[in-house]
Amino acid sequence: MSLFNTFKISASGLAAERLRMDLIADNIANAETTRTAEGGPYRRKLAVFTPYRSFENVLRGELSLQGVKVEKIIEDRSPFKLVYDPDHPDAIPAGPQQGYVQMPNVNIVEEMVDMISATRAYEANVTALNAAKSMALKALEIGRG
């Protein structure tokens, strides 16, 4: 594995965790959004990551990974929370759930745990990047000496 490949792997990890943090921030910001442009309550969003392999490596049968990439962003299909608030403009007007409001399926505690996890993963990628940078600088010093 080349030194530049190490930089590429760390950079892809940093970009992935940044996207994950952006999605978590969106989820927290919309935790009380009862009506979106599509008409229903906000649904929690999650990123699905996969290992990145270059096409050339796959053709050669090599197993070397080259980082991580976002395969897709999915919506959490868990049910919405029902909160009784008959005066809310989005309250269900009739039926057995009359007066209830469908609230987003965002759990703030779960989002905060995910945020801490994403922060730690980001820090780990920064540490790996700094270690690779330090090795490159040492190699240059040895080459000069």
Features from the language model and the residues they span:
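Amphipathic alpha-helical polymerization modules
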Residues: 1-145
